[in-house]
Amino acid sequence: MKEFVSMRLLPEDMFWSCRQSTLAEMKKKFAQVESAAEEPRVLCIIQDTTNSKTVNERVTLNVPASTPLKKLFEDVASKVGYVNGTFDLVWGNGDNVTDMTPIDQNSDKTILDAGFEPGKKNFLHLTDKDGEQPHIMQEESGTTEDSAQDRFIGPLPREGSVGCTNDYVSQSYSYSSVLSKSETGYVGLVNQAMTCYLNSLLQTLFMTPEFRNALYKWEFEESEEDPVTSIPYQLQRLFVLLQTSKKRAIETTDVTRSFGWDSSEAWQQHDVQELCRVMFDALEQKWKQTEQADLINQLYQGKLKDYVRCLECGYEGWRIDTYLDIPLVIRPYGSNQAFASVEEALHAFIQPEILDGPNQYFCERCKKKCDARKGLRFLHFPYLLTLQLKRFDFDYTTMHRIKLNDRMTFPEELDMSIFIDVEDEKSPQTESCTDSGAENEGSCHSDQMSNDFSNDDGVDEGICLESNSAAERIAKVGSEKNSLLYELFSVMVHSGSAAGGHYYACIKSFSDDQWYSFNDQHVSKITQEDIKKTYGGSSGSRGYYSSAFASSTNAYMLIYRLKDPARNAKFLESHEYPDHIKQLVQKERELEEQEKRQREIERNTCKIKLFCMHPTKQIMMENKLEVHKDRTLKEAVGIAYKLMDLEEAVPLDCCRLVKYDEFHDYLERSYEGEEDTPMGLLLGGVKSTYMFDLLLETRRPDQIFQCYKPGEVMVKVHVVDLKTESVAPPISVRAYLNQTVSEFKQLISKATHLPAETMRVVLERCYNDLRLLTVSSKTLKAEGFFRSNKVFIESSESLDRHVAYTDSHLWKLLDRHANTIRLYVSLPEQSPGSQFRRSIYQKPSGDLGNLDEACERVKGPAGNMKSVEAILEESTEKLKSLSLQQQQQEGDNGDSSKSTEASDFENIESPSNEIDSSASVENRELENQIQISDPENLQSEERSDSDVNNDRSTSSVDSDILSSSHSSDTLCNVDNAPIPLANGLDSHSITSSRRSKANQGKKETWDTAEEDSGTDSEYDESGKSRGETQYMYFKSEPYTADEGSGEGQKWLMVHVDKRITLSAFKQQLEPFVGVPSSHFKVFRVYASNQEFESVRLNETLSSFSDDNKITIRLGRALKKGEYRVKVYQLLVNEPEPCKFLLDAVFAKGMTVRQSKEELLPQLREQCGLDLTIDRFRLRKKTWKNPGTVFLDYHIYEEDINISSNWEVFLEILDGVEKMKSMSQLAVLSRRWRPSEMKLDSFQEVVLESSSVEELKEKLSELSGIPLENIEFAKGRGTFPCDISVLEIHQDLDWNPKVSTLNVWPLYICDDGAVIFYRDKTEELMELTDEQRNELMKKESSRLQKTGHRVTYSPRKEKALKIYLDGAPNKDLTQD
C-alpha cells in the first residue's frame, strides 16, 4: 500500500517512463522464455554405476540443446548429490555409442555439438573418476540427512531380492544415506553370503581402541606359522585395510579362511554372541606365550560369586566364576511381561531365589536339608562390559523357537556400582564353608577366595580387587563404586525371526563421538534417535507372539566401555605404528594399487564371442576374445590366431576378423583398410554384451579374401539334380535386397555355370515353406529374403518344368529333403551264448514280411535253428552278393539312370515296396564296403539301464558341430575365382541346416513309454506288419565313431525321412542288425548319455532331430500285455546290496511261479546262477528298498501291479520259504553290540502279526537275549539303513512306546523294514580318544564308500567352530 501511495506521488511523466521500462523488461523476459520453449531439448538418462544399490536406477535430465557440457556436469552433480569434478560421464549402451572415453567436463562445447541427439534418449553412465568413488556433497541442513538416516538404520535388503524397499528414488535423488568412505572415513565389509554376524563383530573390534592397538603391537613371525592360517595376522591385515583402503567395502574371505572355513560355511547362519566366545577362545590359543596372552581376560573378563546361604545357621557355600558376557533375560519364564530396561534385567540377574520344599539345600553345618537362599553376586566388572539380550526363546506350546521383540531400553551411560554388594565383602569370612550347593566343586573357604584374587596380582582388569586384606578390599570397592560408570559404544542389532535374520552394528566412534551404522558394505552416520529405535517393541498393543507388524529389528548385544580417563585409550596414529604394521600398510597399498590398475585394464577390455572354422579339422570352434580397446585390428587378429591355436594349421597372414552373426550364420561385413583402427572404435566401445560376434576367417595361400559389405544378404544355394535325385552342398552367394529375381538368377548362373533361362529358384523361408520364385520383376526383399537365406535351384531341360509345382518331381524331392534327418546308429555286438540264440529268424531276401517262411529257411536238416553266427554271416554274404548284382547291372546297362540311381535295398522286398531309391553311386559303393555282421567280432551287450547310463562309451555330440563338418562350401565371387568360405563355415550335407537352428531352442521330445502300462505290438491282430508307410526314404553309410566308442563297434550314418514309422525304420535296419525287427530294440540316446527305449511302433521319427544317436540292442520286442522287467539280486549282507542281473519279460495274467520258471534258464545262462524254483523268491523293489514278498500264486496285474520298465528283486533263500500268506510280515533284523561297538549281519524275522510283543519274542529266540532286556529301533533312510556305530546308540529312537508296528512312529506295514535291536543290560564300550578317532576314520570311510549315509532328520544347526590349524580335520571325514 505504501508503494502504491508513493507511486501516485511521482510526477506523471516519470510515472509513465517507469511503466514503459517495466513493460519492456517484461517483454524481454517473455521473449527469452518463448525462445527457450522453441529450442529443442535433450533427454539425458544417467545410470550411476559406482554403487551396487543405485546401478539399477536412472536419473533423468531434460535440458536445452544449447547447454554447455560444463553446465550439464553441474546439473548432474546437483541432481545426484555428488561433488562436481569427482565423477566421470561416459556414453551408455545406446545406439550412439562410439567410445568409452569420458566426456570432457570442462568443455564449453554444447551438448548438441558433443553428439547428444534431441528428441531421443541419450544414455550416460556415471563412473568413478581415476578409480576413486565420487565425493558426496555435505548437507547444510540436518533434515535431509536425518530422514535418510532413518531409512538406512534398518537392515539393507539383499541385492536383487524381490520386493525389497528401494532407497534409491529417481524423483528425489539423495545420496546422504549411502555415504562413501571419503565422507564417513570408514570402510564396510562384504557379506560373503550369511556372514553379517561376523561383519558386525569385526567392525566392533576394529572400533575398540584397546583391542586394535594391542593387535597392532603383536608381530607375526612368518617362519613359525603359515600366514594363511594365522587368525591374528589376518585380523591385522583386515584392520589395516579398514583403515587405509579407498574401497567402499573389503572382503573377509582371508579371515574366514584362517578360521579353517570353506565356502559352505559362508552359508551357515550363526549367533554373534556364539562367534564372540569362539573367536576369543581361538585368539587366546594363538596368543599363548606372547605379550597378548591375557589380553581377552584383561579387557572382557569379569568375576561373579555363585553362592548358597543356609537360612537357619547362615552358613554359606560359594564358588567364583568368570564371565565374558552377561546374559540378560528379556521376559521371565512363565511371564507375559518383559523387563522394561537393562537395569531391571540386571537386578533380576542377581536376585536370589529361595530353595524350599523339595528343593531344600543340604547344609553341611546343620547336617540336614534346610531352606536356603541361592544367588549371584558381581565381584568384578571388566573394562569392556558385554551384555547379551536373550531375545531367542523356546515356546513349549508350539514346540518352536521364537524371537522376543519386546521393548527393552538401555542407557547411553550405565552405572554398575549399584550391582557390587559391599555388604557381602563386610560379612565375616572366618567360618569354613564348603560349596555343597555347587556341582563339581570342592571346599571353597574365604582364604581360597582371597587366593583367587591374589593370583591376578599385577593384571590391570579395570576394577581390581587384588588386596589380600578384606578391609583393604572393602575400602577399594567402596572407593571405586562411584567410578563404575560405563559408556555405550556398540549395539549389535538383529533383524528377523528365530528362523533367521540379519545382523548389523551401530557403533560410536571414540574419535568424534559420532554414531555410525555398519551394515555390511554400507557405512552411514546415524543419531541417538536411531539407537532408540533398536529398543524393540511397537507403539500399539501386542500379544505374546512376535507379530509381522511389530518391529523385528532390535538390539541383541550391547558393549560398554568403562569411563576412566587414565585408562581410556585412543587409536594409534600412523606415525605411532610399529615397524611391522608400517610395512604391512605399505604392502597392502601396493596390492590395492595393483588391483586398481587391473580393474582399469578390465574396464577398457572388449570381450566378444569369437568363432572360427578350423581349416583342417573342419569344426566350428568358439571362444571369448578379450582385447584392449586401444589394440588395433591387426593386433587383435594375432591374439585371436593364438587363441584358436592355428599356428600349425594356417599362416597368420591368411587370417582376418570379420563381423559375424552366429544365430543367422551371416557374415555382416569385413574390415578392409581398417587394420590400424582401434578395436574399441571398431566394436562401438567397451560393452558388457555385443549384438554381434566376430569370426576368424581363414583362406588358402593361393586365395584372396572376398569383401563383405554392409547391406548384403547371404544366400546359400543348393543345386538340385533331378536325375540323381541329389541335393548338392551349398555354395554361398551374396546379393542385395533390391535386386530382382531375374538379376538374382543371373548372379547364380555366374556362380554355378547353369543357364538362367531354364532355372527354377525355390526359396525356403521357414520349415516346410518352399516357395517357387515365378515373378522375375519382384525384388528379393518383396519375396521375403532376409540376412541369411537358403534357395534350391534346378536348371535342367526336363518336362518337369511344365508340371504344376506342387505335383512336380522337384517339389517332391525338396519335400523329402526337408524332412530328411541324419541319425547315427550304433549296432549291437553279438556273441555265442546269447539268449537270442533261440527264436531268432533271419529274413530272406525274397520276402522279409513272411516270418513263417523265414523260420523254415533257416532251419537245418534236423529241424534245429541256425546259430546267431551263421545267421549274421549269411546276412553279410547276402549283402555282398546284392552289391555284386548291382555292379553287374551297372555294367550291363551303361548309362541307364535306373541302375545308377538304385538303392542298396532295391532288390530287398519290403511290406510296402515303397523304398525311395535315392542313393548315388558313391554312397552305394560306401555301403557295399561295410561289414556289419563279422562273426569274429560279435559281442553280447545285455546290460541294465544303470549299466548303460553309467558306463557309456560314446557321447552325444552337439548337432551344430556335426552338421557343419561334412564338406567345404564354395563362395562365389563374380570378379574373382571361387574360394571356400571360411573353410567350411557354411558346410552342409543332405541334412537341412535350418532344422538344426530351429531345434536349438526346442527341448528334445522324450519317449513316454515309461508312463504306459504296455507297448504297441509290432504286428496287428491279423499278423500284418505295422511298418507300412509311404515315407520310406532310407540311406545308410558306414561311419567311424569318436575315440572311446569301443573297438569293433559298428556304426551307421543313416539319412531317413522322419515321417517314417518306428516299425518301418526297424525293418530297414534288419539287414544290418542281422535279426528280425521283432528281436531288437531301439534306444534313443540323449545329451546326458541316458538311453530310453522307443517302443511306440506306430509313431514316426518326427521327435528325432539331426545327429541324434540311436543304440540298437538285441532283445525280443514286446507284445501286447507284455512288460520289460529289470531283475536285481538282493544281497542284504553285501556292501552293495543291489546287483543287476538281467532284463526279463513278464506278461499280464502270468503267475509269479511261471515268471520264476522262465527266469531259471536265463539265470543259468546269463548269470551263472544254477537255482531251483524253490530256492529263490521275487519281491517288490522301490528304489533300493526291498518290499513286499511275492508269493508263487500271485498273478501279475491282478494281485501285483506292473508297469513299463518295472524293477523287481530276486532274493536267494538259505532254506525253505517261510512266507506263505500275505498276513505275515517279514522284517530284516540286525543286532547292535554296544560293548563291542559292532553290528551283526542281517537276519530275516517272519512275524504272524504286527505285534511288538511277537517281534521281541522272535528276536529273543534268535539272539538268546532275555525278552525283558530286548530293545529295538527302526532303521532310518534307504536300505540297508547304514549308520555309524558311534551314533547308533544315541541317535536312534530306541524302544518306542507302542504295542503294534503299524502305528506312529514306526509305521511298519510292509515287508522289508530294517529293525536294529540290542540288550539293554549291555554297557557301551568306553573309548579312548585315539580309539574314537580311529573308529571315526573307519566308519567315515565305510559309509562314504557304500554311499548309504543319508540325512534323515531335520537339519540340525551346525556348531560354529574355528579350527586353529587352519582347516577341519579331514581325516575325520575321509579315509
From Swiss-Prot:
UniProtKB keywords: Cytoplasm, DNA damage, DNA repair, Hydrolase, Protease, Thiol protease, Ubl conjugation pathway
SUPFAM superfamilies reported for this sequence: Cysteine proteinases
Composition skew (Polar residues), residue ranges: 429-451, 909-921, 928-938
One GO CC term, this protein: nucleus
Biased composition range(s): Low complexity: 881-890, 953-969
Stored PROSITE patterns: USP_1 (PS00972), USP_2 (PS00973), USP_3 (PS50235)
UniProt KW Hydrolase keyword: yes
Family affiliation: Belongs to the peptidase C19 family. USP47 subfamily.
Cross-referenced PANTHER family: UBIQUITIN CARBOXYL-TERMINAL HYDROLASE (PTHR24006), UBIQUITIN CARBOXYL-TERMINAL HYDROLASE 47 (PTHR24006:SF702)
Name of the protein: Ubiquitin carboxyl-terminal hydrolase 47
Lineage: Eukaryota, Metazoa, Chordata, Craniata, Vertebrata
